[in-house]
């Protein structure tokens, strides 16, 4: 177990499939903010922007950019994300499927319906997780 999370967080994840870990990536906020800003200005081939009917803020989605955006790569390989994921899943190792960035600007009226991510993954495994970093 990593010092960043406690046994209760692991138990919550194991029981409920989700848990909240506050502040575990605080040292990475600036790195990730710069990476996301770059990504928004320079979307990859799968990047998409959506604007609602009222023309408010945009909603942007993009993924699989960690090989071209150094901040994403730095976070993936140098943060405690893998250690945290392994602890939550009680796994000896983790493997990255992909990173996925969602940016919802203020005043956007594009809705995001409640959904489950698992059907979107072409992965069969007993232990998988998504780390959401707001």
State each model region's role:
Residues 1-114, 119-122:
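Non-heme Fe(II)-dependent double-stranded beta-helix
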Residues 122-134:
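Short, conserved beta-strand element in jelly-roll/cupin
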């Amino acid at each position: 177990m990593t010092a960043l999370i406690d046994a209760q967080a692991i138990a919550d994840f194991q029981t409920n499939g989700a848990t909240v870990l506050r502040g575990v990536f605080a040292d990475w906020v600036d790195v990730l903010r710069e990476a996301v800003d770059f990504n928004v200005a320079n979307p990859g081939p799968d990047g998409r922007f959506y604007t609602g009917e009222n023309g408010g803020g945009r909603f942007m989605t993009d993924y699989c950019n960690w090989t071209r955006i150094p901040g994403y790569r730095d976070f993936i390989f140098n943060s405690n994300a893998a250690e945290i994921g392994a602890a939550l899943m009680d796994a000896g190792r983790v493997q990255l499927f992909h990173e996925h960035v969602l940016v919802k600007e203020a005043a956007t009226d594009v809705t995001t319906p409640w959904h489950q991510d698992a059907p979107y993954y072409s992965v069969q495994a007993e232990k998988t997780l998504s780390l959401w970093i707001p």
